[in-house]
Amino acid sequence: MKTVIVYASVHHGNTKKLVEKIAEECKVDLIDAVQQPKADLSDYDRIGFSSGIYFSKFHQTILKFASENLPENKKVFMICTYGGSGAYKSLEVILKEKKTYIIGKFGCKGYDTFGLFKLVGGIAKGHPDEKDLKAAVSFVAGLQ
């Protein structure tokens, strides 16, 4: 199956670190939605979306990319990094509109100095770590 992960990694590189490890270990293509806001995804069997979580939402670049580029009736999975907790609803709304099949969700801690976390020097330092990277690779490798 041909797989792509569309990602946005804009602060500490947490998401980029994760998806690059996945691409290294699994046969997937990567699209940086910040650098390439338009892409034809019709040839892909599985499409992943990945970003950090900002105030309980996927990054706006990912939400816009999914709204504008995602074909209907595709198998889709989500990967997020977060300081607080994972949140998928913002993207799930778009995926539902596109009549997709959600085949999985994965999230892990990521170093976060966004907003108020900056005042305390950040949270989840050192993440994603090796354990997180291995778990992400296992998640993608196990997708049907």
PLM features: what roles do these ranges have?
Residues 27-38:
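A short beta-strand-loop structural module common to alpha/beta enzyme folds
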